[in-house]
Amino acid sequence: MTFELGLNYWPRRRAMYMWRELDLAEVRDEMAQIADIGFEVVRVFALTEDFLPQPLTVDARMVDRLVQVVAVAAEAGLRVVPTLIVLNMSGRIWWPRWMLDAGGAPVDLYSDATALRSQALLVRTCAEALRDAGGAIRAFDLTNEIDDAQRPPSRDAGRGWCALLGDTVRRAAPGVPIQIGAHLPSLSANNNMRVDDLAGIADEDLMHAYPLYCDVARSFLDPELVPFSCALTAGLAGTGRRPLMQEFGLCTAPRGSAGLTITDDFLGQARDQYLASEDEAAEYYYAVLERLVRTGAAGAYAWCYADYDARLFDRPPLAAAIRERTFGLVRADGTEKPAAAVFRAFRSRRDAGAVVQGSVPNVLDVSADEYYRDPATHFARLYSTWCSASSNGGDGA
């Protein structure tokens, strides 16, 4: 199996406003740059606010734009992972107005009949529109970190919601793999989106991990958290599949500046965040990629393509979430940061046969049920063991 290189994508001049302000020429240029760096997959996001503006109403214009973006990516030789239910994105929850009551409280995504039917209609419509895309669709990702938008009220609710959407996509686009965009709370908290439950619905086991958002990480630049999270995901899934790191990355300080810590807004809470120097970011990406290969990951999707144009800084989410402005491998002016060269060199080595994946370490020493009785304690305990083994020259197992 070849280690897969992917990139999460929003355009640098449009960010989350890409669908309502779509510039296909801009997307075409950026997809060409993404392919040139060495990526083979792009993950894009059908923002629910744009695609589902009313109950039981999918905006056909937005679906057509998604089809066009997939076609443009395919022209560049890229395959696409469309994420279909996107409420939580880049430090903001993008609720469609109809999902909020007069007091601003959201509908129950997991039990409200109209909300469920509407979400199922959206994923079905997108899957049907793209099922004949000539192999351009790498997979359908059902959702992005949905529990940050609204935590399922129970394990059964989370599992049932994913199963409904997964079954809907499978009927609409048979044979296309299904992913579910999960993040660290599925490993470290009782968020009712258990990895073993997701593994029974999806065709791939995957995770998002950032030291920036993890109190167990040893530093903002800790290179072990991502490979550990990947290996733990594989252990909890219990499928024997190689795990995919669907999101990892870090934000950077301005070009030529040293790294600095800031206090930033994280979904309404103040949190320290680190803007790495561009050289630190390159070193981090190199270290994490090498560890992911050594510990048997299926691949890695960096977050994200580009920094955003300063003209977007007075609009949500970038007006409040400062870190989200500069997660890119490419600067807002289109020039590449040193981290882009890390991926370009990695792709060259991979294609030359110099990248050899190891086996996934067995890090889990309890059953999934036992683990989820106290996930925070087990996560910290197992990570400590992993780091101790790594410091002694092992692979964390």
Question: Where do the language-model regions lie?
Answer:
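Glycoside hydrolase catalytic-domain groove-lining segments
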Residues: G160, L164-G166, A173-F266, V293, ...
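Aromatic-rich peripheral "rim/lid" segments of glycoside hydrolase catalytic domains that contact
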Residues: M18, M99, Q119, Y284, ...
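Amphipathic alpha-helical segments in well-structured domains
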Residues: V63-L66, G158-C162, V226, A281-Y285, ...
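Short, solvent-exposed beta-strand-terminating loops
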Residues: P82-I93, G249-G259, G299-L312
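Generic structural signal for well-ordered alpha-helical scaffold segments
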Residues: A127-R131, A231-A234, L289
